[in-house]
Regions:
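Short Pro-Gly-centered flexible turn/kink motifs
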Residues: 120-132
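Terminal connector regions
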Residues: 24-29, 34, 130-228
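Surface-exposed coil/turn segments at beta-strand junctions on protein surfaces, enriched
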Residues: 63, 121-123, 136-140
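Exposed beta-strand and adjacent loop surfaces of beta-rich binding modules
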Residues: 67, 90-92, 142
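The feature marks short-to-medium sequence segments in extracytoplasmic or secretory-pathway proteins
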Residues: 77-116, 121
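Bacterial Sec-dependent N-terminal signal peptides
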Residues: 1-25
Length: 231
């Protein structure tokens, strides 16, 4: 009986450690589009108080202790082909720091596989749903979701939540991620952060710098080969 209790305590401790580990370091957003979501009148009426004329409207709600539900509405009168990566929206979570400034508490990890990229068709006035991780901690603040679409940023409503303040620190996971490192190869830390934190036009700037870098490397190789052939 005592042994069983000890094992249970160790298991509880392990689970607690895992949960704490998920809440105390900045990680990449893993939102997942709910393919089984059926738009209801309730889901649509959620947007009734939104007077914004932006082409995309976003409402975030607390689903449970560990999940947010995020509803995304096509607010224009034409079809919206929303960019997706492996059924994930280009979405990260932000929170207000101790000074009241909005800061990212998640980052975006770009896929290296070309097949990962696609789009989600949303008819005019229609709503889709995605779900994203909800954090916990001792720091009471406001959170919101940031969506990047076609080099334009859209924000959800804000919600009062508790997080760990350590989430504001850019973790080693972020710095060691391929998306971050690829930008550093051709540019600097500032642009690397803009890219993984889904700033508008950041990826476009990276793409332009990357093309120039590839052209420079190609030219250097050509000169080297030309020199070797002469020798």
């Amino acid at each position: 009986m005592r042994r069983a209790k000890t094992i249970l305590n160790l298991f509880t401790l392990l689970i607690s450690t895992i949960i704490l580990g998920q809440n105390d370091k900045m990680k990449y957003n893993q939102n997942s589009i709910d393919q089984n979501f059926i738009q209801t009148e309730k889901a649509f009426s959620t947007f009734n108080n939104k007077t914004d004329d932006a082409k995309i409207l976003i409402i975030a709600e607390v689903e449970n202790d560990s999940i947010f539900s995020i509803y995304v509405k096509n607010n224009q009168n034409t079809i919206l082909n929303l960019s997706v990566q492996d059924s994930h929206l280009y979405l990260i979570q932000e929170a207000k720091d101790i000074n009241g400034n909005w800061k990212p508490i998640e980052y975006w990890r770009f896929s290296t596989c070309g097949n990962s990229y696609g789009s989600e068709k949303i008819d005019s006035e229609k709503v889709i749903k995605t779900e994203s991780r909800k954090y916990s901690g001792n720091f009471k603040t406001e959170i919101r979701f940031k969506l990047l679409e076609d080099n334009e940023v859209f924000y959800s409503n804000s919600l009062i939540c508790n997080i760990n303040s350590s989430l504001f620190k850019i973790s080693d996971e972020v710095k060691n991620n391929a998306s971050y490192q690829n930008v550093l190869r051709v540019s600097n830390k500032s642009l690397a952060e803009k890219v993984v934190f889904l700033e508008p036009n950041a990826f476009k700037e990276f793409s332009e710098k990357n093309k120039k870098w590839i052209a420079w490397v190609t030219e250097q190789n050509r000169k080297r080969n030309e020199k070797d052939n002469k020798n």
